[in-house]
UniProtKB/Swiss-Prot annotation:
MF GO annotations: DNA binding; protein heterodimerization activity; structural constituent of chromatin
Organism: Zea mays (Maize)
SUBUNIT field: The nucleosome is a histone octamer containing two molecules each of H2A, H2B, H3 and H4 assembled in one H3-H4 heterotetramer and two H2A-H2B heterodimers. The octamer wraps approximately 147 bp of DNA.
Keywords: Acetylation, Chromosome, DNA-binding, Isopeptide bond, Nucleosome core, Nucleus, Ubl conjugation
Sites bearing N6-acetyllysine, chain numbering: K7, K37
Listed CDD domains: HFD_H2B (cd22910)
Compartment(s) where it occurs, according to its Swiss-Prot or TrEMBL record: Nucleus; Chromosome
Family designation: Belongs to the histone H2B family.
Function per UniProt: Core component of nucleosome. Nucleosomes wrap and compact DNA into chromatin, limiting DNA accessibility to the cellular machineries which require DNA as a template. Histones thereby play a central role in transcription regulation, DNA repair, DNA replication and chromosomal stability. DNA accessibility is regulated via a complex set of post-translational modifications of histones, also called histone code, and nucleosome remodeling.
Transmembrane segments: none
One Gene Ontology term, aspect cellular component: nucleosome
Name of this chain's protein: Histone H2B.1
InterPro entries named in the record: Histone-fold (IPR009072), Histone_H2A/H2B/H3 (IPR007125), Histone_H2B (IPR000558), HISTONE_H2B_site (IPR055333)
PTM (free text): Can be acetylated to form H2BK6ac and H2BK33ac. Monoubiquitinated to form H2BK143ub1; may give a specific tag for epigenetic transcriptional activation.
Amino acid sequence: MAPKAEKKPAAKKPAEEEPATEKVEKAPAGKKPKAEKRLPAGKSKEGGEGKKGKKKAKKSVETYKIYIFKVLKQVHPDIGISSKAMSIMNSFINDIFEKLAAESAKLARYNKKPTITSREIQTSVRLVLPGELAKHAVSEGTKAVTKFTSS
């Protein structure tokens, strides 16, 4: 019996260590356990590439806000614009460009051409924008294309 008594404490030591680690890992009742952060394959916590020093790069969102502001300052230098009004103007420009792109795509499809050229854009501007606004847009667009091709 004496040898069995000596084996029991030796066998209990690993058994005692397991519940101790389980107690540490278990969260109190009513709380969810914290999920561990998973690292990408090949990266470790001790590795040279840690996330502590680097900030996550923001996803760039393209807007027309700076251009709207520049035009506003050219037309009315003393007037400002609220963020809500700027957001509305940005949505308006996105909507107009979307309509022009859709109309240009339709025109290219009707004419069985794979490419949208300045001619399709010009025609779509005439179709989408009303009267005087279309005339001004076409003249400004023609001027911009001429400037681009000459440089």
